[in-house]
Amino acid sequence: MDLMLRILLGITIAIILHELTHLLVIFYYKIPVKAIILTKWTAFGFLIENENYMNDGKKLILLHFLPLIWCLMIFINPNEVFFYMFPFVNIFGGLGDFYFYFKIKTLSSKMRIEWANSCDEKLLKSAIWKREI
């Protein structure tokens, strides 16, 4: 298989698995989803009810850090460029997840929800496509 095709396939699958892992946590903890959006900055994501998970440390950690498990795919075959795309996408693509987690942890309980709701409003303004649920 051509090198560029393997890289593109690895990136595509890594992005899909990253977002599906977020969705798995959302469904497992029954966090209500407000909308699925596609934006020009954050690519693809889910807007969820912030009041449901903001003050629960376990949900917060799993929602933001569980997709990093895909970084372990490199150990399947470290010589294959396809598997290098999983840690690459999940570390660099997950920087937003890191930022949101640590920003949330620095705010008080009341401010967390207000800040998250204002972020949701900003994301909705930059949405290219939105599907409300």
Residue ranges, per PLM feature:
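Metalloprotease/metallohydrolase-associated module, dominated by Zn2+-dependent proteases
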Residues: 46-133
